[in-house]
Curated annotation (Swiss-Prot):
Organism: Clostridium acetobutylicum (strain ATCC 824 / DSM 792 / JCM 1419 / IAM 19013 / LMG 5710 / NBRC 13948 / NRRL B-527 / VKM B-1787 / 2291 / W)
Catalytic site: D89 (proton acceptor), D271 (nucleophile)
E.C. number: 2.4.2.29
Enzyme's top EC category: transferase
Name listed for the protein in its UniProt record: Queuine tRNA-ribosyltransferase
Summary of subunit composition and partner proteins: Homodimer. Within each dimer, one monomer is responsible for RNA recognition and catalysis, while the other monomer binds to the replacement base PreQ1.
Binding site for substrate: D89, S90, G91, G92, F93, D143, Q194, G221
Entries under InterPro entries matching the protein: ArchSynthase1/Queuine_TRR, TGT, TGT-like_sf, tRNA_ribo_trans-like
Keywords: Glycosyltransferase, Metal-binding, Queuosine biosynthesis, Transferase, tRNA processing, Zinc
Function (record text): Catalyzes the base-exchange of a guanine (G) residue with the queuine precursor 7-aminomethyl-7-deazaguanine (PreQ1) at position 34 (anticodon wobble position) in tRNAs with GU(N) anticodons (tRNA-Asp, -Asn, -His and -Tyr). Catalysis occurs through a double-displacement mechanism. The nucleophile active site attacks the C1' of nucleotide 34 to detach the guanine base from the RNA, forming a covalent enzyme-RNA intermediate. The proton acceptor active site deprotonates the incoming PreQ1, allowing a nucleophilic attack on the C1' of the ribose to form the product.
UniProt cross-references to SUPFAM superfamilies, sorted A to Z: tRNA-guanine transglycosylase
Region (RNA binding): 252-258, 276-280
Amino acid sequence: MYTLLKKTGKVRRGRFETVHGTIETPVFMNVGTLAAIKGAVSSMDLKEINCQVELSNTYHLSLRPGDDVVKKLGGLHKFMNWDRPILTDSGGFQVFSLAEIRKIKEEGVYFNSHIDGRKIFMGPEESMKIQSNLASTIAMAFDECVENPSPREYVERSVERTTRWLVRCKEELDRLNSLPDTINKKQMLFGINQGGVYDDIRIEHAKTIAKMDLDGYAIGGLAVGETHEEMYRIIDAVVPHLPQDKPIYLMGVGTPSNILEAVSRGVDFFDCVLPARNGRHGHVFTKHGKINLRNEKFELDASPIDEGCQCPTCKHYSRAYIRHLFKAKEMLAMRLCVLHNLYFYNTLMEDIRNAIDADCFEEFKNEKLKAWAGKA
């Protein structure tokens, strides 16, 4: 259940109660595609850096180790030793972005695995079954994520099919939640708004899915080729037409600046591979913007990544040491940077919540954007 604790303009401060614990919003979900954060970050590490929600991938876990294996081992929470909320995406984005030789039909999608080429079928029912086997806290509806830009006629047909798929997802998850051998009988379902860069299609779709009794609503199909200005315009168009008593999730976004802009437009949930991916390449976030620790200028820099940061990395290691680790190709370099970046994001969200509580979010946002000046 979502409780709107405070609203100032469009900015929302909320609390989302789940079977696996309470989520304070706005929140950033830390992406562990295969039930682990790339960069040797464990579930215990995630707790230390104040992660509220972990996000795992339905498509990838269905291939390795297999959702049936995870179910036999007690579900994703037991499998990865994590007792806080987990959101699993539906697999739709990966099917449409990674898989080869796709055939989209009303029943679902036929495609070849990006790992071994074997033929696979996934539709709404299959996606729900996999997510039920994984026993995540929140399941995402199976949808088609179209590229931006795509022809209007195709987007209209795709959105209509995505709506029909959502109805099937809800019916199937309701059925699965009632079965005696289901691990998480209180698994939640979020629907996904699509429509490419066409505001009117987006709005109509938002109105349609808002009539369904879902646990939350996501805005999908962004950060896939459109400009930041287009993304913000679409958020502005869609959010007013989604239920205001449910969480709103902007999928796959984004930079710290993107997050601040989206929070100011009424978004509650975020996820992105960016902080971990950047960290693995030595790009780290600071209060003054992003820096590249591989640069020679950090060779003798004994200061932490970000002065005043309380993450495990900044409390114990210097920029010079981490640069040395990258140059020596030591795996520890990636781990230390990923830990820092995820802590930076999680702390940013905590600071955002505190700013909303203190009625100073707009000042906080402007101060951050000015300090980063396009560098975050």
